[in-house]
C-alpha cells in the first residue's frame, strides 16, 4: 500500500523505505512517459534538424552520413530518452522534494524552493549558451583543419553524441549556484569555507571541464571554465546572503528559547 498520504517525518524506518520506493516508482513512470512523449516531439518538432543546423555549413549537401540502416532510429531513440529525462525532471524533483520536505525547517524551505526554480533557468541558460556560442565555435575550430587531402565523412551517431554531451554538460554545470545555495541553507557549507577553498575549486573546475568537454578541443574546455569560475564567485555571494539570514534566524530562535 502506498505511503504517499502520510507524513515522512512521523514514519518509522520501514515506512520511510516504503515511501521512498513509491517515490522512485512514480519518478521512473514519469521518465518512461516522458520518453514516449519525447519520441513524438523529436519526430514532429524536427529536433534532429535543429541539432544538425550548426554543422550544416560544413556538410556536402547539408546532410550527415550514417553507417547502418538502424543508425537514424537509434539516434532518435537516444534523443527521445534525453527529452524524456528533461520532461520528467519536474516530476522527479517534486517526488524528491515531497520525500525530503517534512524534515526541513521552514527557513530552509523558503530558500530551497526558489533555488529549484532558479535551477531551471540556469540549466536552460547553459544549454542555450552551448548551442548558440560554444557549439558553433567548436565546429569552426575543428572543421578549420580540413584540407584538400582530407575527405569529410561526418557520421550522425558520433556527431549527435558530441552535441548532446556538450548541451547537457553546460546545462548541468550551470547548476553550481543552486547546489551551493541549498548546501548553505542547510548549514553544510559557509561562505568562509567556500572562499578559503577557491584555489581548490578552480582546480576542480578545470578537471571537471576537461572531463565533460571534448578532450581534443581545449578552447571548449576554457569556455566552460570561465563561466564556472564566475558562477562559483556568484555562489559565494549567494551563500553569504543565505548564511547571514540563517544565523540571524538561529540567534532569534535561541533568544526565544
Report each predicted region and the residues it spans.
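Membrane topogenic/interface segments and analogous intrinsically disordered interaction regions
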Residues: 1-257
Amino acid at each position: 500500500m502506498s505511503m504517499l498520504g502520510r507524513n515522512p517525518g512521523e514514519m518509522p524506518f520501514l515506512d520511510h523505505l516504503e515511501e521512498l520506493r513509491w517515490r522512485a516508482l512514480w519518478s521512473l513512470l514519469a521518465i518512461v512517459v516522458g520518453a514516449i512523449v519525447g519520441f513524438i516531439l523529436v519526430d514532429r518538432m524536427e529536433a534532429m534538424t535543429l541539432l544538425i543546423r550548426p554543422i550544416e555549413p560544413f556538410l556536402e549537401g547539408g546532410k550527415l552520413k550514417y553507417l547502418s540502416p538502424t543508425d537514424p532510429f537509434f539516434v532518435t531513440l537516444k534523443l527521445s530518452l534525453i527529452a524524456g529525462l528533461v520532461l520528467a525532471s519536474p516530476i522527479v524533483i517534486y517526488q524528491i522534494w515531497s520525500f525530503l520536505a517534512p524534515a526541513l525547517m521552514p527557513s530552509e524551505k523558503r530558500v530551497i524552493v526558489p533555488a529549484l526554480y532558479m535551477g531551471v533557468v540556469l540549466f536552460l541558460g547553459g544549454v542555450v549558451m552551448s548551442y548558440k556560442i560554444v557549439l558553433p565555435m567548436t565546429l569552426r575550430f575543428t572543421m578549420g583543419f580540413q584540407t584538400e587531402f582530407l575527405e569529410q565523412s561526418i557520421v550522425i551517431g558520433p556527431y549527435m553524441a558530441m552535441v548532446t554531451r556538450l548541451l547537457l554538460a553546460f546545462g548541468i554545470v550551470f547548476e553550481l549556484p543552486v547546489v551551493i545555495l541549498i548546501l548553505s541553507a542547510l548549514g553544510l557549507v559557509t561562505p568562509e569555507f567556500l572562499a578559503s577553498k577557491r584555489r581548490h575549486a578552480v582546480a576542480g573546475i578545470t578537471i571537471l571541464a576537461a572531463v565533460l568537454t571534448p578532450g581534443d578541443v581545449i578552447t571548449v574546455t576554457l569556455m566552460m571554465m570561465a563561466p564556472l569560475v564566475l558562477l562559483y564567485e556568484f555562489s559565494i555571494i549567494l551563500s553569504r546572503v543565505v548564511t547571514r539570514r540563517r544565523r540571524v534566524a538561529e540567534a532569534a530562535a535561541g533568544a526565544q528559547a
